[in-house]
Amino acid sequence: MPERRSIYDRTTRGIRIYLATPRLRGLLAVNVAVSAAASMVFVNTVVIIQGGMGLTQSAVALALALASFGAGSMIAALALPSLLNKLTDRSVMLSGVGLLVVGMFAGTLMVGQHSLMALWFVLGLGYSAAQTPSGRLLWRSSHQEDRPALFAAQFALSHISWLLFYPLAGWLGARYSMTIAFAVLGCAAALAVWVALRVWSSIDSKEIEHEHSNLPEGHPHHATGSLTPNGIRHSHPFVVDDYHPRWPSSGR
């Protein structure tokens, strides 16, 4: 029977699991890159349409721009089940944020409604490719009883970056120009991608060999591992929990 925990304890536990898991630290960096790029779409589309780049002031132009972003997102989402059968979550998500970075720097050269629609379509592709597999990572990185806390941590931590980039996108566009906003947020997204590549190893094995030195007598791990001078050594799908508080260095 899982131990009952307070809301505060569950939230804290989720954040501790999240930050102790390398692939989830990579996911956090991906979330930062996504929010940096997508803030331009969600905050500045109306401003761009109404004069930031001299486009026609029209509800139709706005609808077409947002529809382009939505179409890119939908196409990526529909393609992902097939892609994820052939590629790793890491490859797909980092390709998605890479596409966002390229799109942000391309935005510094954007002129006219057709280029805006094409760019928003590309950003939609990258946004969906980077975001959609995140639930798989959270599921893979937790026991059933810890998943509510871990999903809560994902919600809280990812929204910190939205809290930063929403006002920053608006301020940069209003204070300087859309070109500057694209460039600055593109640099922020690129930095986040670099961090993701550093903290999320391409070698992300499901099962990791590791050693326990302080298991209680009668713990099931005694039956599945081999004795060593320091304790029990064995291999199984690794998630951070009470008996596995730190990620093994061999699993990176």
Language-model region placement:
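Helix-to-loop junctions at the C-terminal end of transmembrane segments
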Residues: 75-89, 173-174
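Helix-loop junctions at membrane interfaces in 12-TM secondary transporters
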Residues: 108-120
